[in-house]
Amino acid sequence: MAARVVTVFGGSGFIGRHLVGRLAKQAWIVRVAVRRPSRATFLKPLGDVGQITPVRAPVQDPVAVEAAVTGAEAVVNLAGILYERGKQSFTGVHARGAQTVAEAAAAAGVARLVQVSAIGADRHGVAEYARSKGAGEDAVKTAFPGAAILRPSIVFGPEDDFFNRFAALARLSPALPLIGGGTTRFQPVYVGDVADAIAKCVDEPARAGQTYELGGPRVYSFKELMELLLREIRRRRLLLPWPFGLAEFQAGFLELLPVPPLTRDQVRMLRRDNVVAEGALTLADLGIAATAVEVILPTYLDRYRPHGRFNRPSLV
């Protein structure tokens, strides 16, 4: 039987590293298309010798993208950024990049394309991130009508940039900020469940043309997530309400840092709930039981406790 090839753009990122391992176990030959292949070599041990190959293919480079998808049966686009820097813009990566991948996949005769977007993607949204994701979805649907689109809520897991960031802050600061009072609602989804969902769409032709919104089994306010975090790391910290206006003003200065902890665009995103829409196709429609936050957090946040994994049970 001929080898099945899948190209994963952005495959060295948080979701990508979980997806690549799953695809390798399903006997796919995996091309990991990234900007810097040398930073994706850590993925090779997830498969057999020669099964996982990093290749240089930035989504803004049509020639490199064309080469990366040639001969592939399936393509996954995970390429994304959380803030803009230099040539890396939301429009360039999320919109034009997605269009480039979709057009190249269609021209190469790829059988299945999976576009990973985000809950709240809307080309008329309040934040540029959401607008670029929405524009990307529209471009993909035009170029490759049979593409499956997945929209996760905030994704959590060992390498996440959400719980890890606030847990690290709680080690140093006596207070955690509640932007907008902490009332924004989220439906955190486990990275393993997201990877399973993508793998199903890669493997199952029946998923073509469908849009799925991926969330966990429960909805939380931002404040509830911070309370859950503090219980898990066994620390007491002040939860300080931070008005949207003040947060956006301060984020303007934080954006000047090489790796900004907060941007004005992210503050604007927090003005909208990030939960699965009523009537949307979900993890359940893919045959996946969503994993609860409370099950996974103890497996990686214990290192933020006052005494690490050997912490005494008392709060400090």
Q: Where does each model-flagged region fall?
A:
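N-terminal Rossmann NAD(P)H-binding glycine-rich loop of SDR-like oxidoreductase domains
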Residues: 2-28
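Conserved glycine-rich Rossmann-like NAD(P)H-binding loop of the short-chain dehydrogenase/reductase
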Residues: 28-38
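Conserved Rossmann-fold NAD(P)-dependent oxidoreductase catalytic core, especially the SDR/UDP-sugar
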Residues: 29, 81-143, 147-153
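Alpha-helical membrane-targeting segments
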Residues: 42, 165-191, 231-277
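NAD(P)H-binding glycine-rich loop region in Rossmannoid oxidoreductase-like domains
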Residues: 37-100, 104-107, 119-123
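Substrate-positioning beta->alpha
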Residues: 161-162, 181-203, 210-213
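Mid/C-terminal beta-alpha module of Rossmann-like enzyme folds, strongest
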Residues: 198-263, 276-316
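Flexible, glycine-rich beta-alpha linker
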Residues: 127, 148-167, 220
